[in-house]
């Protein structure tokens, strides 16, 4: 039909997420009448906004990510005088379809957002910098500096939608899968008499007797689907979560051997790699449906149907001859599917979140020397570098004290560092001078 544009179905995208930067702390001094310097009153910066993914039943595809491939949360506001802390950056909540799996750049699965409302923080906002009021202490009564806010996390993630259905209808193109799901549920897929009419999974809810379950009409598979031929991997992905596999066979097609076709589809299912703790696709409960019996008119065609039923019953317990057009055999077929779905557990397995507890004896920094430069790496020292305003000598002195308390100066002495050697921390190069009072580092220019 001309003049109609079907909505695009997108089930795999790569997206960049950037959390908000933390606001800078404020360095200010309270001034009162008769007390021109009444003490520090600089507020701290607000934390940057974080980004969350949330499973939403109103979303069906990832097409919105195709149009917008980068999401950013807002920054935290800077601190102000009179002890006014900066406002926190606004968090960003991004909706995704239920059944969205999230992977990092290395291909490791981070989460599986299956249940409606399930939420995942993908990037965390940067910490706001402390104002000079928070930095004041017995050594520094009135600091003339504040800490800078930290940048927010940045990540590139791959999102994949896998249909959440109890039953998957599989088979070659044009065997009548869309007609079946239209007949047994309220789903209204596009139906036409040519191959690859269905280009994305159609989901339908079936109510048969006391049973209620969901069915997915998976686009037609071809030989080599498990290796990606004919968008096979994209299609097979949507079968991963199903409990029951229904092979739909066109018993009126005289140009294709139904038995060899069944074996070929089974081979593709067996070669598709599922999650480690999931049942292989070819090992799950299966039902064979011989569709389009309304087309069979001659005695020869009827005899062929009986022959196919006898052959397939040797391979599979449940074999049904149906017609999606006349609805013949659908009642018995849908009731049996309900029984199987109730008997076998769902393959939907949300990813559990693991909390990693750091080892007690993990060193807080490491020191090595390459190309004549001592390089210090570690979460704390690199974080402190980002927090330092290098235009302030007092801020640099404060940084040096923190590095010294962490044990970096002693480590440099043990490593054989001498006055004038270069030390790199977090991309910033210092000149080490152990003779300088109160600080062992001077910033190289």
UniProtKB/Swiss-Prot annotation:
Q: Does the keyword Protease apply?
A: no
HAMAP family in the record: GTPase_Obg
Which Gene3D superfamilies would you find in this protein's record?
Answer: GTP-binding protein OBG, C-terminal domain, GTP1/OBG domain, P-loop containing nucleotide triphosphate hydrolases
Which cofactors are named for this entry? Mg(2+)
Where primarily located? Answer: cytoplasm
Assembly: Monomer.
Q: Which residues form the OCT domain?
A: 357-434
Homology family: Belongs to the TRAFAC class OBG-HflX-like GTPase superfamily. OBG GTPase family.
Q: Name one Pfam family in it.
A: DUF1967
Q: Which GO terms describe its cellular component?
A: cytoplasm
Q: What is its EC number?
A: 3.6.5.-
**Protein name per Swiss-Prot or TrEMBL:** GTPase Obg
Enumerate the residues binding Mg(2+): 178, 198
SUPFAM superfamilies reported for this sequence: Obg GTP-binding protein C-terminal domain (SSF102741), Obg GTP-binding protein N-terminal domain (SSF82051), P-loop containing nucleoside triphosphate hydrolases (SSF52540)
Q: Gene name on record?
A: obg
The organism that produces this protein has a lineage beginning with:
Bacteria, Bacillati, Actinomycetota, Actinomycetes, Micrococcales
Q: Which GO terms describe its biological process?
A: ribosome biogenesis
| Limits of the Obg domain | 7-164
Q: Which GO terms describe its molecular function?
A: GTP binding; GTPase activity; magnesium ion binding
Q: What does this protein do?
A: An essential GTPase which binds GTP, GDP and possibly (p)ppGpp with moderate affinity, with high nucleotide exchange rates and a fairly low GTP hydrolysis rate. Plays a role in control of the cell cycle, stress response, ribosome biogenesis and in those bacteria that undergo differentiation, in morphogenesis control.
| Entry binding sites for GTP | 171-178, 196-200, 217-220, 291-294, 323-325
Keywords from the named record: Cytoplasm, GTP-binding, Hydrolase, Magnesium, Metal-binding, Nucleotide-binding
Cellular location(s)? Cytoplasm
Task: Give residue ranges for domain OBG-type G.
Answer: 165-342
EC class, as a word, reads hydrolase
């Amino acid at each position: 039909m001309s003049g109609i544009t079907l909505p695009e179905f997108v089930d795999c995208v790569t997206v960049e997420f950037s959390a908000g930067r933390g606001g800078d702390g404020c360095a200010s001094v309270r001034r009162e009448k008769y007390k021109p310097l009444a003490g520090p009153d600089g507020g701290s910066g607000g934390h940057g906004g974080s980004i969350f993914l949330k499973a939403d039943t109103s979303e069906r595809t990832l097409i919105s990510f195709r149009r917008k491939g980068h999401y950013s949360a807002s920054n935290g506001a800077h601190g102000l005088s009179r002890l006014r802390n900066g406002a926190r950056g606004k968090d960003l909540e991004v909706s995704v379809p239920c059944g969205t799996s999230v992977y990092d750049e290395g291909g490791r699965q981070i989460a599986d957002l299956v249940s409606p409302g399930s939420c995942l923080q993908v990037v965390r906002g940067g910490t706001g910098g402390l104002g000079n009021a928070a930095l004041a202490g017995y050594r520094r009564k009135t600091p003339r500096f504040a800490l800078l806010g930290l940048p927010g996390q940045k990540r590139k993630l791959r999102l994949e939608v896998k249909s959440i259905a109890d039953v998957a209808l599989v088979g070659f193109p044009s065997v009548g899968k869309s007609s079946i799901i239209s007949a047994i549920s309220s789903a209204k897929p596009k139906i036409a008499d040519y191959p690859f009419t269905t280009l994305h999974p159609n989901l339908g809810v079936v109510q048969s007797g006391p049973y209620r379950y969901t069915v997915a009409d998976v686009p037609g598979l071809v030989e080599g689907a498990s290796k990606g031929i004919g968008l096979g991997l994209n299609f097979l992905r949507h079968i991963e979560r199903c409990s029951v596999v229904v092979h739909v066979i066109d018993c009126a097609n005289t140009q294709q051997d139904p038995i060899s076709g069944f074996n070929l589809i089974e081979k593709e299912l067996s070669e598709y790699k599922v999650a480690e703790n999931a049942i292989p696709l070819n090992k799950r409960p299966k039902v064979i449906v011989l569709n389009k019996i309304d087309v069979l008119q001659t005695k020869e065609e009827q005899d062929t149907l009986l022959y196919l039923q006898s052959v397939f019953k040797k391979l599979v317990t449940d074999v049904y001859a149906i017609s999606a057009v006349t609805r013949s055999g659908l009642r018995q077929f849908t009731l049996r599917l309900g029984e199987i779905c109730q008997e076998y557990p769902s393959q939907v397995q949300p990813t559990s979140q693991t909390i990693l507890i750091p080892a007690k004896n993990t060193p807080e920094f490491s020191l090595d020397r390459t190309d004549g430069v001592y390089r210090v790496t570690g979460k704390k020292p690199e974080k402190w570098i980002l927090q330092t305003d290098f235009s302030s000598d007092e801020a640099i002195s404060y940084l040096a004290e923190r590095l010294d308390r962490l044990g970096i100066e002693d480590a440099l002495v043990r490593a054989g560092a001498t006055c004038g050697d270069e030390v790199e921390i977090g991309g910033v190069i210092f000149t080490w001078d152990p003779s300088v009072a109160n600080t062992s580092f001077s910033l190289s220019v």
